[in-house]
Amino acid sequence: VGILSIKTPATTAPVTLSEAKAQLREVGTAEDTLITALITAATQEAEQIMQRAVMPQQWRWVMDAFDTDGDNRISIPTPARAVASVSYVRETDGTTVALTVTTDYLADVRSEFYALVFPAYGTSWPVPRAQPGAVEIVLDVGWADAASVPQIVKNWILMRVAALFENRAAWTSGEAIFRNQFVDRLLDRWTVATV
């Protein structure tokens, strides 16, 4: 079992300010700062719902040991474009050691829903120091660029931006703003199932 966290956040958005303004039928520039913030909020909400990154970024998977459930594979519950690094704290001297891809470990990132990391043929995982967070795997996650993000995910983000723009408060006249279930179901195809 590990802890997944953002190491390096995304620096670009999946939809442009122009695309969002077209969705809103907004032509002026007075609301540009707000709309840009809403794009960020909607993107982060999509990531939370789908349990996956939208734009390129790095996530860190931290474990106390090479937790493999007995089959030597480490299954990380998020899709990845690549495994950027695997490192551990050496048991004997407490030094952080970076493992080498193909020599020490291999990665399988073909799945849309998880990444696998396992020792290279003929090797086994080293024994890390018995301390919290002794093993760290850094993943390159998210679609490669905005053009690679599925259009349905972009459509959800644009619709969410429009809903947030129109309803700038969580409550109106004492009544909650209801979410459109159909719109939220658009993300189902890309949602990582959690157990």
Question: What feature does the model see in each segment?
Answer:
Residues 1-195:
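Divalent metal-cofactor coordination and adjacent catalytic microenvironments
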